């Protein structure tokens, strides 16, 4: 049965045979498909969300493989410690918690006993694993957004997920540097503030989206080391929206010592061509990628735009699809 939980529960009135069909659903999605309109949310709040969730779980029979709790931002979150404890005893495979709180919701220790987890998504939570926690041995996807966790605990958490393939980190709190040690990682998305990012043992990583709000390169070695650690990189999206001191442009080499031979798709956003750092960085990546097939460039309105496009075509001798945008005046150019 693939109906939303709200509609599935309504089928109980069809016949005696259908009455408890919904109670055996392996996937419970308590999100906007249940809450519906703002008016519905108000009704649920008055009825006490904790009681509603408890009633659903009490009636449910059989395993729960996937559970999602996504509450609107203006709703006071219910006490869900018992809920997570219940799920930990049901071999949960896919768990998503989106909790709208001013202060982060501290995850109970029971979540760290969900050793069958394959997918974990957390929003506005505080993560502090107990000392005895040995990791999620089966986890393949981890998404953390507005989560509070120390740099050391995050590094430990990632390194203790040996099968991790997909990692998403957005606006982490209390995390100044990140070390990612994930031998099976294929895809990495990052957005937020950070001082240091170290990629270690990520030889299979092929897709990276990097949107830093601060970025620092102290020497040519720093940039070289970043790209040497991801030899299998095929798809790169880098956002240059952040301001970078032009003095740091001296740390950008003409081209990387080791070519990015696997890189086929390159996306660079918010490039200011009159900014020496942005220009140096963009040209370095293009010169270092001999097998590029697709480039997407978003350039802040700039008098050097046409000249830059000409140079890109001159450098890239192979067949190339180029999508170029000027952001400020919304001009679009597509070359193929």
Residue ranges and their predicted role:
Residues 125-126, 134-202, 224-227, 273-278, ...:
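Plant-skewed but cross-kingdom recognition/interaction modules and surfaces
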């Amino acid at each position: 049965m693939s109906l939303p939980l709200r509609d599935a529960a309504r089928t109980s009135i069809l016949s005696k045979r259908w009455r408890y069909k919904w109670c055996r659903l392996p996937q419970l999605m308590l999100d906007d498909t249940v809450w519906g309109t703002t008016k519905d949310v108000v009704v649920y709040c008055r009825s006490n969300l904790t009681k509603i969730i408890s009633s659903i779980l009490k009636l449910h029979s059989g395993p729960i493989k996937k559970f999602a709790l996504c509450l609107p931002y203006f709703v006071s979150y219910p006490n869900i410690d018992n809920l997570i404890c219940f799920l930990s005893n049901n071999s949960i495979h896919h768990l998503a918690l989106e909790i709208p709180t001013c202060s982060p919701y501290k995850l109970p220790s029971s979540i760290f006993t969900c050793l069958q987890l394959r997918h974990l998504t957390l929003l506005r939570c505080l993560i502090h694993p107990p000392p005895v926690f040995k990791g999620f041995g089966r986890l393949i996807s981890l998404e953390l957004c507005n989560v509070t966790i120390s740099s050391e605990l995050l590094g430990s958490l990632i390194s203790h997920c040996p099968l991790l393939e997909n990692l998403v980190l957005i606006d982490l709190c209390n995390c100044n540097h990140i070390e990612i040690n994930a031998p099976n990682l294929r895809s990495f998305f990052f957005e937020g503030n950070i001082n240091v990012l170290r990629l270690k043992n990520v030889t299979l990583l092929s897709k990276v989206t990097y949107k830093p709000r601060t970025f620092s390169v102290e020497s040519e070695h720093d940039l070289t080391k970043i790209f040497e650690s991801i030899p299998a990189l095929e798809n790169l999206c880098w956002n240059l929206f952040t301001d970078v001191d032009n003095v740091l442009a001296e740390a950008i080499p003409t081209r990387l010592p080791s070519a990015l031979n696997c890189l086929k798709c390159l996306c660079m956003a918010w490039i200011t061509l009159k900014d020496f750092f942005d220009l140096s960085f963009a040209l370095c990546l293009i010169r270092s990628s001999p097998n590029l097939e697709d480039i997407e460039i978003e350039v802040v309105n700039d008098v050097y735009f046409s000249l830059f496009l000409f140079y890109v075509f001159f450098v890239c001798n192979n067949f190339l699809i180029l999508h170029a945008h000027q952001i400020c005046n919304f001009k679009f150019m597509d070359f193929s």
